[in-house]
């Protein structure tokens, strides 16, 4: 059974091919109109202006050919559904029109064989152009019609059977080349579509830099694994009571503004966005690409999120809107990571396990401890002396038999970073 990602790829590829067929149909019709316009102008000049009867005989049929070409272009613009079948116009319009014009030219030409040979070149060009339809059936139909028209002209020109068969072989070779070109175009479109979908899927979870590295490593489909990571949960304080005072569209606007700012901070520190849980944010560091500094990045991200919230609140205050407060919990430990969900409907690359649960519990403790950020001992030990730490009283959390040691971090000042002593 094809999974959801596979169906999405196939559906997107089908839409991409249909869109490309539409663009190619319009471009091909414009090329035909310009080409027929140029030849019609030449025919009018030599036939009507210069009075050359051998050119004047072409003017009425070529004017009719030009009119049909122009009407075809107009129809493609007005009726988009016709673009999918635009390749048939090569077989139903161009091939018969060229045969008609050359049929008229045969009695007037001193070299009927030359007329038939020139027509062979025109038909070969049409076959190659039919590859732009991105449909092999169209190319084969154009080739068959061109072969019939070319053989008929050569018979009228009294050219030998061997030459007629050779002409068919030449047109067949052109068809083979056109089909190969068509295959290459479809392959390139498929590859480009798959890469774009892969980039879009990765971009949902990972920062642009991480997504690019994963794509270079061809790791869009990550395998399940147990890995040490740093989990971060962020939650808006008193969001329920705040949302009850707002209209639905205001709630959505608030969350979009808040999440937009916070996700940029997360990605700036190389974090992986796991999910939005109402007004909460779940992020982890150190996966899917290993990062020995995941604890430090997680703590710095938490500090920068609190700082970014000050910018958000300044904008909200200027608009007369209430300020927001957040609580952030950070914990480091082993977690199971992989694509979890329905293989036929929806899969999400996520982290599960006790580490995730404890990180969420630590975030909840920020409400009772009245601090914006709390981190576990494991995170504090791995992040090291990059930050200053204040140890809080251990806290009891559901699911743990022993109280959990928690710390609140803050950035060092420039003087402290230079090595000056500072109080913890």
UniProtKB/Swiss-Prot annotation:
It catalyses: ATP = 3',5'-cyclic AMP + diphosphate. Inhibited by adenosine. Activated by GTP. It is a multi-pass membrane protein. Residues 230-363 form the Guanylate cyclase domain. The gene is cyaA. Belongs to the adenylyl cyclase class-3 family. Keywords: ATP-binding, cAMP biosynthesis, Cell membrane, Lyase, Magnesium, Membrane, Metal-binding, Nucleotide-binding, Transmembrane, Transmembrane helix. Its EC number is 4.6.1.1. Its main location: membrane. This is Adenylate cyclase 1. It comes from the Bacteria. CDD domains: CHD. PANTHER family: ADENYLATE CYCLASE, TERMINAL-DIFFERENTIATION SPECIFIC, ADENYLATE CYCLASE, TERMINAL-DIFFERENTIATION SPECIFIC-RELATED. It holds the Pfam family Guanylate_cyc. Binds 1 Mg(2+) ion per subunit. SMART domains: CYCc. Gene3D superfamilies: Nucleotide cyclase.
């Amino acid at each position: 059974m094809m999974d959801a990602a596979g169906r999405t790829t196939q559906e997107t590829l089908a839409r991409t091919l249909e869109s490309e067929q539409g663009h190619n149909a319009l471009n091909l019709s414009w090329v035909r109109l310009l080409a027929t316009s140029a030849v019609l102008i030449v025919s009018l000049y030599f036939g009507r202006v210069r009075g050359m009867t051998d050119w004047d005989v072409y003017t009425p049929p070529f004017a009719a050919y030009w009119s049909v070409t122009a009407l075809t272009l107009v129809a493609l613009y007005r009726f988009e559904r016709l673009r999918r079948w635009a390749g048939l116009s090569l077989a139903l319009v161009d091939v018969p029109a060229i045969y008609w014009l050359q049929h008229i030219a045969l009695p007037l030409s001193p070299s009927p064989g030359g007329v038939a040979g020139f027509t062979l070149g025109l038909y070969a060009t049409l076959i190659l152009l039919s590859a732009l339809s991105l449909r092999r059936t169209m190319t084969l139909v154009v080739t068959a019609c061109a072969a019939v028209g070319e053989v008929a002209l050569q018979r009228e020109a009294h050219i030998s059977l061997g030459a007629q068969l050779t002409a068919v072989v030449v047109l067949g070779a052109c068809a083979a080349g056109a089909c190969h070109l068509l295959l290459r175009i479809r392959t390139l479109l498929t590859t480009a579509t798959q890469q774009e979908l892969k980039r879009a899927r990765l971009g949902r979870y990972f920062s642009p830099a991480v997504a690019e590295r994963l794509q270079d490593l061809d790791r869009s489909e990550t395998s399940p694994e147990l890995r040490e990571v740093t989990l971060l949960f962020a939650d808006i304080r008193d969001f329920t009571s705040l949302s009850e005072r707002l209209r639905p569209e205001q709630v959505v606007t608030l969350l979009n503004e808040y999440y937009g700012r916070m996700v940029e901070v997360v990605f700036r520190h190389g974090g992986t966005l796991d999910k939005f849980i109402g007004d909460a944010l779940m992020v982890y560091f150190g996966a899917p690409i290993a990062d020995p500094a995941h604890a430090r990045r997680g703590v710095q991200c938490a500090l920068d999120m609190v700082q970014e919230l000050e910018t958000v609140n300044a904008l909200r205050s200027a608009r007369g809107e209430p300020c927001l407060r957040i609580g952030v919990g950070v914990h480091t430990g082993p977690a199971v990571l992989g694509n979890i969900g329905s293989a036929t409907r929806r899969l999400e690359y996520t982290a599960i396990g006790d580490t995730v649960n404890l990180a969420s519990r630590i975030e909840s403790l920020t409400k009772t401890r009245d601090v914006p950020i709390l981190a576990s001992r494991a995170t504090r030990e791995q992040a090291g002396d990059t930050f200053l730490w204040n140890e809080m009283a251990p806290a009891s959390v559901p699911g743990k038999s022993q109280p959990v040691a928690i710390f609140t971090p803050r950035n060092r000042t420039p003087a402290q970073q230079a090595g000056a002593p500072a109080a913890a």
